[in-house]
């Protein structure tokens, strides 16, 4: 076991939703590039709004609904089905699924944690900024705050391997892979 330092690298995992994706969204809101009241399909035209089972009632899903987990999107996508259908990894296939999947509830009537909300926000950030979320966060957030060891793919910035396992289980090990949130 080694002592932790200011250069120790942790996996942010789902903390990246609030510490990066939400903050990057707010940066673009502050710059007038995104409006919280806008429908998601303003930025992702194929994104479908909520429609009641009988088709008589409709409700727009807004950017604000994604940030507050009130969109009605499911928590996760059917990973195995999506890999079989589109291959893995396939961000375009995932967004096709998110854009058309069944909504769990009418927007703004309930709250349910959803990774799909923040994957959708990632896509909005990338379309509006013309950069990947990783590039935008690094340039407009991490570097501005002097967070030199913060990144979505830390091995690119820190090849020293100064990593902390997030678990001390016998099976725990460092796993490098694609990020989705």
Model region roles, listed by residue range:
Residues 11-37, 118-126:
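Active-site SXXK
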Residues 1-12, 33, 49-50, 96-100:
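Short, conserved catalytic-motif segment at the N-terminal edge
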Residues 23-29, 44, 67-74:
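Generic hydrophobic/packing signal
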Residues 51-181:
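Short, surface-exposed loop or secondary-structure junction motifs
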Residues 36-52, 144-145:
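Short, glycine/proline-biased beta-turn/loop segments that scaffold the active-site neighborhood
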């Amino acid at each position: 076991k080694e002592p932790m330092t200011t250069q120790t690298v942790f996996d942010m995992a789902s903390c990246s939703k609030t510490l990066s994706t939400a903050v990057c969204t707010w940066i673009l809101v502050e710059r007038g590039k995104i409006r919280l009241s806008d429908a998601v399909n303003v930025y992702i035209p194929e994104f479908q709004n909520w429609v009641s089972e009988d088709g008589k009632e409709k409700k727009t899903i807004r950017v604000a609904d994604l940030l507050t987990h009130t969109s009605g999107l499911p928590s996760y996508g059917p990973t195995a089905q999506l890999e079989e259908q589109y291959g893995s990894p396939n961000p375009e296939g995932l967004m096709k699924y998110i854009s058309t999947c069944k909504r769990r509830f009418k927007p703004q009537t309930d709250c349910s944690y959803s990774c799909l909300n923040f994957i959708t926000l990632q896509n909005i950030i990338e379309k509006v900024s013309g950069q990947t979320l990783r590039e935008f966060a690094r340039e407009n957030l991490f570097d501005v705050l002097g967070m030199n060891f913060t990144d979505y793919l830390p091995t690119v910035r820190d090849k020293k391997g100064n990593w902390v396992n997030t678990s001390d289980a016998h099976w725990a090990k460092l796993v490098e892979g694609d990020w989705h949130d």
